[in-house]
């Protein structure tokens, strides 16, 4: 399983997503409330998935995506308006309100992509 980092500005959002993932068998490596924390956590891991909101007190999701290690994929969970205005390639998005099964299926798809990439190396 991939390393998972969860980053949202509200701690309760982070905890709710962590609970959903833990109950579904995923291991969450770090929970963060700022972009800087998310990047530091990702840089300490070899690879994985960053599940992120769109706005933090210190940066926007585009900046986080730009500085994210290449071995990491990013899953943006945001309002439909935020997702429509995005101009970032290689970014997986889920619109709010989000259903639990959508999150789990998306993570499964992203993990499959990471696994395929590792096999090619």
Region annotations inferred by a language model:
Residues 63, 78-95, 105:
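Alpha4 helix (beta4-alpha4-beta5 surface) of REC/receiver domains from two-component response regulators
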Residues 14, 35-38, 48-69, 79-82:
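Conserved phosphotransfer microenvironments
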Residues 98-111:
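C-terminal output helix
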Residues 44-45:
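Active-site charged/polar residues at nucleotide-handling catalytic sites that mediate phosphoryl
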Residues 108-121:
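The C-terminal output helix
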Residues 11-30:
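Two-component/phosphorelay signaling modules centered on CheY-like receiver
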Residues 7-8:
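Conserved acidic carboxylate
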């Amino acid at each position: 399983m991939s390393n998972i980092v969860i980053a949202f500005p509200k701690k309760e959002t982070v905890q709710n997503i962590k609970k959903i993932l833990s109950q579904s068998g995923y291991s969450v490596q770090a929970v963060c409330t700022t972009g800087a924390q998310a990047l530091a956590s990702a840089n300490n891991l070899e690879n994985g998935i960053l599940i992120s909101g769109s706005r933090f007190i210190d940066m926007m999701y585009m900046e986080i995506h730009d500085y994210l290690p290449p071995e990491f994929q990013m899953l943006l969970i945001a309002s439909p308006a935020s997702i429509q205005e995005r101009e970032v390639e290689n970014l997986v998005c889920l619109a709010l309100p989000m259903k639990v099964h959508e999150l789990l299926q998306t993570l499964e798809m992203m993990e499959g992509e990471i696994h395929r990439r590792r096999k090619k190396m």
